[in-house]
Amino acid sequence: MISNYDITDSKSSSKVLRPPGGGSSDIFGSDMPQTPRNVKNRMVSNIFSVEKDNSVKNTVRQGAHRFYFIGDNPRRGQKPVDSHSRLFGEPMRPITPGKNHMKSSIPFGQNTETAAAAQKLLTNGSSTANTTNGHQYNGKSGSVSSASSSVSSSTENLKMNSGSRSVYIRNMSNNEKSKQTKTDTAGCPLTPVASAAAPPPADVLGIDLPCLDLEVGDVPKDNEIYTETGKHDVNIQTRRDSGSNVEQPHSLEKMRSTANLKEPLALCPDYVKEVHGPCNARNPITGLGLNGDGVGGLKPVKQKIREGNPVTGEGYRAGGTDYIKAAGSTNSGSVGNGDNGGNSVVNKNRVPPGGYSSGLW
């Protein structure tokens, strides 16, 4: 505790100051709270330990969770609170018979009469115990009983009395046959009776009605008169009647068809015939073209005679691009003999082969 002494009015006043940050601050070295920490060791086995009573936890619930209804389980760690049992006592639940899982699965029929006959046959005159609604309470008596157990015991009784299930099946089939015969004779006759067809509704079309077999009557007199076609003299008869036949020039096989109106009969008066001139087009890259013949050909190549000596320049002109006649002939560019090129005078005005750096002259 820190005291602050004030000298005003010669009186000492003691004031307790709170540490910065509130009373939870530990600046002034207050003692640690003595609340024990509950550290749970999760590696400890609790197989043989006694369960702790953790029921005093979160007993105050908010909203609709405060109320428990029948069959609701409380949350984990709380006491089971049943509002119905707390207010009205233990509820009266109906007692249901126990389920016998060892009962027989033999079907005994669907209707009650057949089931009663099967039950009477299986019991073989033995009386059932006086139970509520034909069943005994589970756990109320010493013997285990239910509807299925009584059927099982009756089956055992049938075996003990040297009974046979074939007798039961035969009796069941006889009962079914007699019942079916009675039903047929009473309600439905053995021979079917033709029922009158219901009239069709007014909005049904004629095409929707079922087809009826109509009997063909007598042939009219007009249909009996006919003319035989193709009946003529044997001498002039051919394999087929055609337009060349004299007696029957117009046959059914060679009838004149209708004119095709889409095809014009003659040229239109404003029709101008296009004149196609010769195509002189040629591919400038490959040299292929039509040349007007429509077949195609090669580009004519100008033949060049290169008979001059590229070293001495014999046979070439001064330009170096034109060709001359034969090697050894005189021209303005070079002079030489017809013998060889060794005695010829080289015209050094032209560019030597390989350029001036070749060192030829």
UniProtKB/Swiss-Prot annotation:
Entry GO MF terms: microtubule binding; structural constituent of cytoskeleton
Biased composition (Polar residues): 1-15, 155-165
Residue numbers bearing the Phosphoserine modification: S24, S105, S143, S154
Biased composition range(s): Basic and acidic residues: 73-87
Coarse class of the protein's main subcellular location: nucleus
Key word Nucleus present: yes
Modified residues annotated as Phosphothreonine in this record: T35, T96
Biased composition (Low complexity): 125-134, 141-154
Signal peptide residue numbers: none
The keyword Iron appears for this protein: no
InterPro entries linked: JUPITER
GO process annotations (BP): positive regulation of microtubule polymerization
Source organism superkingdom: Eukaryota
Coiled coil: none
Subcellular location: Nucleus; Cytoplasm; Cytoplasm, Cytoskeleton; Cytoplasm, Cytoskeleton, Spindle
Alphabetically ordered keywords of this record: Cytoplasm, Cytoskeleton, Microtubule, Nucleus, Phosphoprotein
Protein name from the UniProt record: Microtubule-associated protein Jupiter
Naturally occurring in which organism (per UniProt): Drosophila persimilis
